[in-house]
């Protein structure tokens, strides 16, 4: 049930993103990069919720980890509401657009009865790949380390100068949840062409557009 809803919302996100003018998407990506640069220089976080917020789905990006069958939406913040419907982005960390001097930290539940989310995160090994799809781009990260920390130590996971890092966080031990498992990955640039996220046929696009159009009409009528 959860995965079916997740597939639908991700499909809607991709559809809206694909039908957004390239200039707007490029501007959104550049704004996120500027945000990350400012975060590295002075730790200021301004207009966080408005950046990477291109669609009505509220999704900022998606994450795919083929080796553990993860394909999930990423949302702003780490509230209970966010973590019950997908993967959360720690506001104090870099946005998921990559670049030098960036460290994006994402978190997800483990062992939820209704959803797997990051349940299998402990199965990741060095060199396993993680894909972030954002603003019509695909960023590739490779696992370099995994370790366990206290919950409060997550706040100390800062940016490493010159590095482009991604860390995934979930609760551990399984079912006890007193500590945090961290899987750390580093950006790579594969020579082989990266498999892009799913593309849709005309028939699929028309079918997926129905709820999007309905939402737009509803908002207009509500005004």
What spans do the regions from the language model cover?
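Juxtamembrane interface at the cytosolic side of transmembrane helices
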Residues: 213-223
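Solvent-exposed, non-transmembrane regions of membrane-associated and secreted proteins
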Residues: 1-208
């Amino acid at each position: 049930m959860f995965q079916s809803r997740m597939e639908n919302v991700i499909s809607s996100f991709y559809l809206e993103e694909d039908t957004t003018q390239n200039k707007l998407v490029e501007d959104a990506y550049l704004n996120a990069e500027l945000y990350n640069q400012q975060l590295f220089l002075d730790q200021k976080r301004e207009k966080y919720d408005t950046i990477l917020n291109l669609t009505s789905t509220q999704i900022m990006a998606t994450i795919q980890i083929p080796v553990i069958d993860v394909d999930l939406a990423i949302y702003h913040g780490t509230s209970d509401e966010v973590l019950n419907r997908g993967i959360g982005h720690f506001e104090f960390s870099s946005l998921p657009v990559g670049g030098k001097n960036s460290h994006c930290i994402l978190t997800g539940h483990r062992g939820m009865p209704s959803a797997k989310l990051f349940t299998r995160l402990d199965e990741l090994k060095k060199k396993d790949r993680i894909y972030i799809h954002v603003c019509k781009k695909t960023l590739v990260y490779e696992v370099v380390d995994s370790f366990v920390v206290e919950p409060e130590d997550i706040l100390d996971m800062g940016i490493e100068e010159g590095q482009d890092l991604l860390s995934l966080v979930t609760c551990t031990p399984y079912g006890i949840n007193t500590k945090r498992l961290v899987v750390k990955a580093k950006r790579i640039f594969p020579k082989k062409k990266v498999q892009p996220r799913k593309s849709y046929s005309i028939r699929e696009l028309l079918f997926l557009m129905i709820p999007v159009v309905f939402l737009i009409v509803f908002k207009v009528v509500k005004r």
